[in-house]
Amino acid sequence: MSLYFPTPAECGRHVIFGTVPIRTYAGDGIQLSLVDIPAGGVVDWHSHPQEQMGMMVTGRAVFEIGDEVKELGPGDFYLIPGGVRHRVTSPAGPAQALDVFHPVRPEYR
């Protein structure tokens, strides 16, 4: 495995909230997560100590962060401070988002 150029097969693969597959790759202090939300998929309410930010790649998804709600589409960015409850749904069709976490989420290495 190349440290600098991992293949998709070499990245971490997990399923979150029962139906949402993610692929992950992490360095010492930062982590990427490619999230594929199926049509009707839900990343249910949760929080974590890591700071999270990301960008919608394809499709549309509704982000609920704290007490704010916004539908995002391709190219839209979001920021989720550590400790803030959040939820994401994709009611109209599949969606893909690219998340960045700092520090790394060890459970998804």
Place the predicted regions along the sequence by residue.
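A short, N-terminal "cap"/entry segment at the start of jelly-roll beta-barrel domains
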Residues: 1-29
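Structural motif
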Residues: 31, 60-62, 69, 85, ...
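Conserved short histidine dyad/triad with adjacent acidic residue
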Residues: 33-47
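Glycine- and acidic-residue-biased ligand/ion/polar-headgroup-sensing regions
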Residues: 50-52, 56-61
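Ligand-binding loop in jelly-roll beta-barrel domains
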Residues: 82-107
